[in-house]
Curated annotation (Swiss-Prot):
The gene is fmt. This is Methionyl-tRNA formyltransferase. InterPro entries: Fmt, Formyl_trans_C, Formyl_transf_N, Formyl_transf_N_sf, Formyl_transferase-like_C_sf, GART_AS, Met-tRNA-FMT_C, Met-tRNA-FMT_N. Belongs to the Fmt family. It comes from Natranaerobius thermophilus (strain ATCC BAA-1301 / DSM 18059 / JW/NM-WN-LF). It comes from the Bacteria.
């Protein structure tokens, strides 16, 4: 089948590789324009472009997918399928209607759960034990199209977003090719999403990164730290500076007095400082002070002379 793939970040790369290895034709990769990044503000190509060029696949980088020129470029290919994976622009109806078979999307959750931009982060932050990959037919509403195929992925008790991401990009490309093969044979029965089961995974905001110990229980802090690892990272404030928290352990200390406040270091454990939450406490086991490399909780205690009674802001 003639296929147009649309994607931009690292997440899209394994799907490009999978289609290129398959029996289907990958005729064009559509991705976002090169952007200026880094201290030198040099133009950087998106990962999808780098991979496509490495594989000798044509690349198209429209500033907007909504203009007539973009439509004509895609239309000239006469695609059987359009496949998207983290492209970064909403596709207009006339492009969704272009392929002879379908326009399909790879989404990193078990739809209808976690529609939106940050499904892996949100699932881990919420303490879910399972998520997955869904291949869905695209429609006018975000992530609301019919389900064509899916596969579950378990989330371990200590898994981070990074750990789950690795599982998703292992399972997802295989699932995509399986779905493309079935679509070619007309052997897919679309399944409508249950609108009563919908939940959302909005894009992360700066305030999501802040650990408010007065707001979150020890389990919630533990899950948020996992969900924000390796990017963008959870943080609190120590001596007025940002303190990144990369790993914690749930802890229920009985040693603090009733006057201690959430965010207060109430105990010095051999694994790290123990911080009071609105319910229970956590041990900070991997920490990164501002301007420093990440360190163990024990190293933080020794290097910064940490004692009970210090308040994290």
């Amino acid at each position: 089948m003639r296929t147009i793939f649309m994607g931009t970040p690292d997440f899209s790369v394994p799907f490009i590789e999978a289609i290129a290895r398959s029996t289907h034709n990958l005729n064009l990769v559509v991705t976002q324009p090169d952007r200026r990044k880094g201290r030198g503000k040099e133009l950087q190509p998106p990962p999808a472009k780098r991979k496509a060029e490495e594989l000798g696949i044509d690349v198209f980088q429209p500033e907007s997918i909504h203009n007539n020129y973009a439509y004509q470029i895609l239309s000239d290919i006469e695609p059987h399928l359009i496949v998207t994976a983290a492209y970064g622009q909403i596709l207009p109806r006339k492009i969704l209607d272009l392929p002879r078979i379908k326009a399909i999307n790879v989404h990193a959750s078990l739809l209808p759960e976690y529609r939106g931009a940050a499904p892996i982060h949100r699932a881990v932050m919420d303490g879910k034990e399972q998520t997955g990959v869904t291949i869905m037919e695209m429609c006018d509403k975000m992530d609301a199209g019919d389900i064509l195929n899916y596969e579950s992925v378990d989330i371990g008790k200590t898994d981070t977003t990074g750990d789950v991401y690795k599982q998703i990009i292992t399972v997802g490309p295989q699932l995509l090719i399986e779905t493309m093969d079935l679509l070619e044979k007309n052997q897919v029965t679309p399944l409508k999403q249950d609108e009563n089961q919908v939940s959302y995974a909005p894009k992360l905001k700066k305030e999501d990164e802040y650990l408010d110990f007065s707001k979150y229980t020890n389990t919630e802090v533990f899950n948020r730290v996992r969900g924000l690892n390796p990017w963008p990272g959870a943080f609190t404030k120590f001596e007025g500076k940002r303190l990144k928290i990369w790993e914690t352990k749930v802890h229920n200390s009985s040693s603090f007095n009733s006057n201690s406040k959430p965010g207060e270091i109430i105990e010095i454990n051999q694994q790290g400082p123990v911080v009071k939450c609105c319910q229970g406490s956590v041990i900070l086991t991997k920490i990164q002070p501002s301007g420093k490399k990440a360190m163990t909780g024990e190293q933080f205690i020794r290097g910064y002379d940490i004692k009970s009674g210090i308040q994290l802001e």
